[in-house]
């Protein structure tokens, strides 16, 4: 019952570990796992409605950077094709991918 729903602890998801101290540090730093569905869509939280604009932007750029850095070496072509943000159970808002990636590069420089 719990396994298919993703509720069982698992080494793959990082919920079972031999290094408890590191797991606690990661959790306190705000480590977020992202999941990919069968269509290749990535689902991950980037903040809460209560966050201010600057904090949300920082989180969005950090999330996109994490996805770009996770690109497998053998993957060819454009890795991120579009970005859409939404609240839980609300319509999404499309984000300009080219401008977002450009700003991400500017922030890294």
UniProtKB/Swiss-Prot annotation:
Coiled coil: none annotated. InterPro entries: Ribosomal_uL1-like (IPR023674), Ribosomal_uL1/biogenesis (IPR028364), Ribosomal_uL1_3-a/b-sand (IPR016095). The keyword Transferase does not apply. One of its GO terms (biological process) is regulation of translation. Keywords: Repressor, Ribonucleoprotein, Ribosomal protein, RNA-binding, rRNA-binding, Translation regulation, tRNA-binding. It holds the Pfam family Ribosomal_L1. GO terms for molecular function: rRNA binding; tRNA binding. One of its GO terms (cellular component) is ribosome. Part of the 50S ribosomal subunit. Belongs to the universal ribosomal protein uL1 family. Binds directly to 23S rRNA. The L1 stalk is quite mobile in the ribosome, and is involved in E site tRNA release. This is Large ribosomal subunit protein uL1. It comes from Aquifex pyrophilus.
